[in-house]
UniProtKB/Swiss-Prot annotation:
This is Small ribosomal subunit protein uS9c. InterPro entries: Ribosomal_Su5_D2-typ_SF (IPR020568), Ribosomal_uS9 (IPR000754), Ribosomal_uS9_bac/plastid (IPR023035), Ribosomal_uS9_CS (IPR020574), Ribsml_uS5_D2-typ_fold_subgr (IPR014721). It comes from Ostreococcus tauri. The keyword Membrane does not apply. One of its GO terms (biological process) is translation. GO terms for molecular function: RNA binding; structural constituent of ribosome. Belongs to the universal ribosomal protein uS9 family.
Length: 127
């Protein structure tokens, strides 16, 4: 049994992905079925596998923490793409062109004192 591991991050979410081969196509997130855990964001994590036209011969075990469901699903997608690149270096080109290996570094900006939010100032009155 071969195992490839990679980490993906997005906003506050961190996902540690392990892809095991050979497998039965099981995908677990925090020991829960991925479809049940991610609900509407489930299709997002399968995109790297669909791009490479890989069938369900792998088991994928994922540990996530932080962030919301969308951030976690994007972190999982990045982790899966990185693990697939470790598995076979020829996968790198199609995954890179599809944008699955790009780390989105946007994070929430902190609130500053004297302001209502990160950039929103209280209403200005001249008189």
């Amino acid at each position: 049994m071969q195992v490839w591991s990679a980490t993906g991050r997005r906003k506050r979410a961190v996902a540690q992905v392990r892809i095991c081969s050979p497998g039965t196509g099981t995908i677990k997130v925090n020991q829960v079925d991925a479809e049940q855990y991610l609900q509407g964001a489930y299709a997002n994590i399968l995109k790297p596998f669909e791009k490479l036209q890989l069938d369900a011969t792998y088991d994928i075990f994922i540990r996530t923490e932080g962030g919301g469901l969308t951030g976690q699903s994007d972190a999982i997608r990045l982790g899966c793409a990185r693990a697939l690149c470790m598995m076979n270096s020829e996968y790198r080109t199609p995954l890179k062109s599809a944008g699955f290996l790009t780390r989105i570094a946007l994070k929430k900006e902190r609130k500053k004192y004297g302001l209502k939010k990160a950039r929103k100032a209280p209403q200005f009155s001249k008189r």
